Amino acid sequence: MSERIEIPAEKLHEEMLKLRQGKHMDFLRSLTGMDWGEEGLGVVYHLEDTNTRENIVVSTRTTNREKPELPSVSDIWKGAEFNEREVYDYYGIRFIGHPDMRRLFLRDDWVGYPLRKDYDESLNPLRMTNEEPVDTTQYIEVQHDGSVIEKRETIFDEDEYIINIGPQHPATHGVLRFRVSLEGEIIKKLDVHCGYIHRGIEKMCESLTYPQTLALTDRLDYLGAHQNRHALCMCIEQAMGVEVSERVRSEEHTS
């Protein structure tokens, strides 16, 4: 059983640094955005000590739904950079100190944040035009007086040689595109664009019954259909308090 901790937003970065250094939580397994309704918007972090396999689950939240902000942990775990961008994309939570607070999957002109419970789908009719490329990153910083400012930096300079790799390239399987800056055959910079075949499965599941969602989990990854369905079934069984047979438990441990 994982240890569970709730940390106030104002102490999050300090306490997460203690977990990383003091308890050797060197692996951020996942970082998930949450909408708890009246209790606020927040994030759940799953941390692991790769030596002992000890796990800690950390949660934090903000009650400010109009302008939700939380400290970034991307300077503690590098892998948090894309996870925090995903949370911003779907929940609108901005992470203070994150080096690149752009959307990750959705268009930059998307209105609203689709995984919020109060999201209005009518705000985004089907667009038949291409989105304009964004060549600047957004950095959010807290000043000494407590005020929050936004800084922008240019991704590529005017004299850089830029090429696209994907989404049609065989190596990217149609799911993402890279913009790369080249110096000869050396890649100097790489800008990742995801979400080309994103289908909003998580949002669709909110309005379906448990049995109806099983077919959708199979489609998340055509190379991992069984694992995704299996994980969802285990989650549903645990939430409902269902006791499965010994045979099923044995298969869970071997799959």
Predicted regions, residues:
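Terminal low-complexity/charged segments
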Residues: 1-186
